[in-house]
């Protein structure tokens, strides 16, 4: 049953992503976006997943519902490629989403068996109070991690983010933690995985074009590792 649920969920996300954009354009209220980030290193939730990377994305939004695809391709041969699909809903500050993460660790994209897959299906729920956003994430299927007893851990992550402006720059402070033991985040119990500060600014190139840049300083107290990431958005 777990295999079938995982397969149906992932295939639904893939099929919806492949809907022709000619059909989408006929609906005036649908908004579409496409772009890419170029980052000095791929850092996620206090973990370095790769070096210099290109991260393209494409998405559509309609009345609070959104469907998006995001990828990561590193320039180093040791970097694993990643493709993620997210189906989400938001209303005011409330948000709910389902994300299929796939990192190419050697098992093909079309492998969905519970113990023979590189897919991870994650559910998210959160609320943005403007001054503070709270988000909870839980892995519900796929290669989602186990606890010390070898049982499914439902590996989870909770994030608190606080945006603010200072000196003409937009800042975001964040702290993220995993609440219980799991090998997905390499935690033996409650563990703070990331404390970070990100700065964002648009540099005006011409009257009609500005280049968004960002820099993020992140620390993982659990591993005593620190990262400084720079990126450009196009």
Question: At which residue positions do the language-model features occur?
Answer:
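Outer membrane beta-barrel transmembrane domains
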Residues: 170-205
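Detector for outer-membrane/organellar transmembrane beta-barrel domains
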Residues: 114-182
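Transmembrane beta-strand segments that form the barrel wall of outer-membrane beta-barrel proteins
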Residues: 34-42, 65-75, 95-104, 108, ...
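Cleavable N-terminal export/targeting peptides
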Residues: 1-31
């Amino acid at each position: 049953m777990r295999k079938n649920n995982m397969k149906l969920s992932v295939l639904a996300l893939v099929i919806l992503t492949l809907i022709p954009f000619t059909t989408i354009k006929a609906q005036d209220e649908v908004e579409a976006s496409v772009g890419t980030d170029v980052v000095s290193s791929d850092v996620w939730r206090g973990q370095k997943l790769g070096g210099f990377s290109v991260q393209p994305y494409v998405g559509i939004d309609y009345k609070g519902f959104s469907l998006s695809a995001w990828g990561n391709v590193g320039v180093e041969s040791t970097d694993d490629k990643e493709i993620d699909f997210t189906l989400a809903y938001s209303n005011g500050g409330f948000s709910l989403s389902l994300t299929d993460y796939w990192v190419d660790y050697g098992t093909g994209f079309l492998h969905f068996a519970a113990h023979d897959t590189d897919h991870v299906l994650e559910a998210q729920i959160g609320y943005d109070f403007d001054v503070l956003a709270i988000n909870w994430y839980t892995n519900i299927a796929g290669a989602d991690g186990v606890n010390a007893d070898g049982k499914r851990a439902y590996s989870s992550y909770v994030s608190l983010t606080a945006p603010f402006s200072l000196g003409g720059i937009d800042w975001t402070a964040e702290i993220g933690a995993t609440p219980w033991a799991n090998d997905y985040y390499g935690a033996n119990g409650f563990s703070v995985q990331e404390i970070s500060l990100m700065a964002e600014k648009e540099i005006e190139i011409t009257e009609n074009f500005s280049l968004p840049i960002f820099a993020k300083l992140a620390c993982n107290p659990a591993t005593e590792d620190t990262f400084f990431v720079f990126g450009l958005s196009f």
